[in-house]
Amino acid sequence: MRKIALLALAAILFVACSPNREKHLEQIAAFEERITESPISAANPETADSLTDLYVSFADKFEKDSLAPVFLLKAGEVQSNVLHTEHAVEIFDRLIEDYPDFEDLPMCYYLKANAYDMNSQYEEAKAAYEFFVSKYPNHFMARAAQVSLDHLGMSPEEMLADILAHADDTIIAQNSEMI
């Protein structure tokens, strides 16, 4: 009798929690859709904070859900895009700590480095990019991380001049590999 009562209680809790999860997912989807329809609002820090709150709230409530790390990654990206670097890094660090087996963990490390870079925190960016490149040398973003490292702290004009100055060398090297 006790087992049946426990099973019934578990079933009730499962059913009670499921709509909450679905409701939360619907709220996230609706918010994301509104932002997609109005890209200007996506750059608004208040809008970014609201969306981040939804993502983080989902991860808090459903930490074992496979979408929890996905939403944390999105939350970190959103905060990074509005230059809330400290908050972005906190979220990325939480993701790294809580979900070490997350399939997109390398992207989390890259985005963390990029958040520092975008906020002109070059020492932190350098360390984070170097970590990423050494840990994930074959990741599709490794080349971008190396380019960012090579141009860390440069103005856009300086970066362009450096890239153009080395463009001929790159083309010659690529052509010699073909021969």
For each predicted feature, which ranges?
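Acidic, polar-rich low-complexity tracts and alpha-helical solenoid repeat scaffolds
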Residues: A16-I179
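Sec-dependent bacterial lipoprotein signal peptides
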Residues: M1-C17
